[in-house]
Amino acid sequence: MSGSTITPWVVGNWKMNPMRANANQLIEEFKQLLQQNQIADENCHVGVAPVSIALTTVQAQLQDAARTVHTVAQDVSRVAGTGAYTGEVSAELLKDSQINFVLVGHSERRDIFGDNVEILKAKLQNALNAGMTVIYCVGESLEQREQGQAEQVVLQQICDIAPVVTAEQWQNQVVIAYEPIWAIGTGKTASPQDAQAMHAKIREGLCQLTPAGSNIAILYGGSVKAENAVELAACPDINGALVGGASLKAASFYQIVQAFAQSK
C-alpha cells in the first residue's frame, strides 16, 4: 500500500559538524532561502539535527524562520529521567528544553558505538514515553545486500522494536528512515527503483505490524543530494529524506526540501 498521501519529511543530520560560526551562517542562509521562496508547513515537515550542545541555540535561531523548522536530537540516553549518569541526556531533559524530535538507531550509532537491539529499544521506549517523535533508522550493509538478505535484515530491525511501541505511538510518534549503510558517506546511492522497492517492502511490513502502517512516513537516507532528490521524491513510498552532507550547505538542503514539498 502506497504512502503517497503522507506529508513528507526532510531532516538534515549534521552529525559531528560544523563549528559554531559555520552553524550560525548555515542557519541564517537557510532562513533567507525560506524567506525568499516560502514552502508551506503542510507541504513538508522540515528538521535539522545539530550536535547536542547546539540544540537550544539552533532552536532559538530558527524561531523567526518563515516556516516551522524542527530541531531534532541526534541521539538520546537509554536511561530515563535524571540521575548520576555522566555524559547522558535523557528524553525527559530533551523535552524539558522543548526538543520534541530525536533520531534513534542511526547506523553510525550501531556500528561505531555499539547500540544493539536492547539499547535501541530502551532509547526508543524512553523517547516515546516522554512524548517525543522518533525517527527510527534501519538499513543493511553491503555484505548483507550482496547475500540477498537486505529485506530480511531491514524488516527484522523493525520487528525488533514492535514490543515497545503502542498502537497510538505508531500512529502519532514514529517515523522510519531507511538508510542503506553502503550508501552513507560513500557517494553511492541506490537507484530510485531500488529505494522504492525497499520502501514498499517496509510499508508492507509496517502494515502487518500496525493498522497505522499505511500512514507512517518512510524517509530515504542514502546519500540524498539536490541532484537526485526530485527523482527520489517521485517514488510513492519515499516520504522524505534523512540528509547528511548535503544538509551542511543551505542551498542544497533547501533544494531537497523543495523537491519533496512539490512532489506530493
Curated annotation (Swiss-Prot):
UniProt keywords, alphabetically: Cytoplasm, Gluconeogenesis, Glycolysis, Isomerase
Entry annotation: catalytic residues: H106 (electrophile), E179 (proton acceptor)
One protein family per Pfam: TIM
Main subcellular location of this protein, as a coarse class: cytoplasm
GO molecular function: triose-phosphate isomerase activity
Residues binding substrate: N13, W14, K15, G185, S223, G244, G245
PROSITE patterns: TIM_1, TIM_2
Catalytic activities: D-glyceraldehyde 3-phosphate = dihydroxyacetone phosphate
Quaternary structure and interacting proteins, as annotated: Homodimer.
UniProt function note: Involved in the gluconeogenesis. Catalyzes stereospecifically the conversion of dihydroxyacetone phosphate (DHAP) to D-glyceraldehyde-3-phosphate (G3P).
UniProt protein name: Triosephosphate isomerase
Organism from which the protein derives: Acinetobacter baumannii (strain AYE)
